């Protein structure tokens, strides 16, 4: 199952970015909440009480009718709330209830979903309860006083957030159709590919960029498996997109990536990999989606016996974000190899949903440690990798318990990821590793409990 998502909602200047940094123990969020500065949703990883989750910050939500970005901001907030398990509404305890807070509360009351009111800037625990009491008037339930900058009350808040998460179940796989999103720049042949797959004219096919301005869903059955195919609007640089219907189509395209089980990234064989293709590859990897790369218009390429291998090498060097993805060369016009898309997509989805027992994970880690020990600092302190366990699927996610995460640099982390992939497979899907610090005595207790459970 995918990691649960926590949405951060609120007006500007209430400390949302500071809270994100506090919850995720990072400094990645830009602490500058001028209205309109952050309109895109940004994601960071969080961890509390043995639960991994995603935190999405939508930026400052305003309802000023004069705001140029009002439709865009509302769209981003709606998308964040749709995917969130729980929404945290951030308000300013020192300033009190404002008209903007009331507008946001009214906006949220019209929606279903779990919501917690978080009263920030309550630096004193004693005064915090009194400052928070007035926010009962918003009608969103109990307010939680915190100080994002000092960490006061954030532990209690996280306890409540985690309690609202669905129970962990690695076997939970939806019976709904497999969602396959067809992603790519404008005019690379996405709609033609969809029509070729379905054997009918389902999407408008045109050489004019931007013909498909919305996502188009098509349900089909292939070899007994139900599929939901999504043809998305062509995605290009935001500065080249005029504000209007095309903008919202691109937003829904990004949403299609987030909600898909597998993405088909379509590359134009005549153009090769562009900067925008690389951005899309990065987005797919960032969202943790299974993926296959389709090189379309292969019929239009002049080629010899070496062309395919040379092009694959060139494409893989540029799409390094997706070095784990399978690749297939197709022609939507002639139907060449289009049927093979289903086989590769099925493999990618199955791998993204696969789970591995803790004992098998640790066999791979033990072997990796034999070949290459963790690095040692100049002061003589060495990293220790105690054990690992799979905590989620779609994408396969593993928590690795170590003495101090900061002792493991990016080079060694990439080495461990490669060893896990080589030892366990996972073709066509990214894998996520979460490095968590833990005391040796706690590790020994965990291992003892696991061994006892096996004996019982």
Curated annotation (Swiss-Prot):
Residues that hold GTP 1 according to the record: 10-17, 57-61, 120-123
Keyword Protein transport carried by entry: no
GO biological processes: ribosome biogenesis
Sites where the protein binds GTP 2: 184-191, 231-235, 296-299
Domain KH-like: 354-439
Function field: GTPase that plays an essential role in the late steps of ribosome biogenesis.
Stated family: Belongs to the TRAFAC class TrmE-Era-EngA-EngB-Septin-like GTPase superfamily. EngA (Der) GTPase family.
UniProt xrefs under NCBIfam families: GTPase_EngA (TIGR03594), small_GTP (TIGR00231)
This protein's encoding gene: der
GO molecular function, one term: GTP binding
Source taxon at top rank: Bacteria
Protein name as it appears in the record: GTPase Der
SUPFAM superfamilies documented for this protein: P-loop containing nucleoside triphosphate hydrolases (SSF52540)
Assembly and oligomerization: Associates with the 50S ribosomal subunit.
Assigned keywords, A-Z: GTP-binding, Nucleotide-binding, Repeat, Ribosome biogenesis
The organism's taxonomic lineage, starting at the top: Bacteria, Bacillati, Cyanobacteriota, Cyanophyceae, Synechococcales
EngA-type G domain span: 4-169, 178-353
InterPro entries: AAA+_ATPase (IPR003593), G_ENGA (IPR031166), GTP-bd (IPR006073), GTPase_Der (IPR016484), KH_dom-like (IPR032859), KH_dom-like_a/b (IPR015946), P-loop_NTPase (IPR027417), Small_GTP-bd (IPR005225)
Organism in which the protein naturally occurs: Prochlorococcus marinus (strain NATL2A)
Pfam entry (one): KH_dom-like
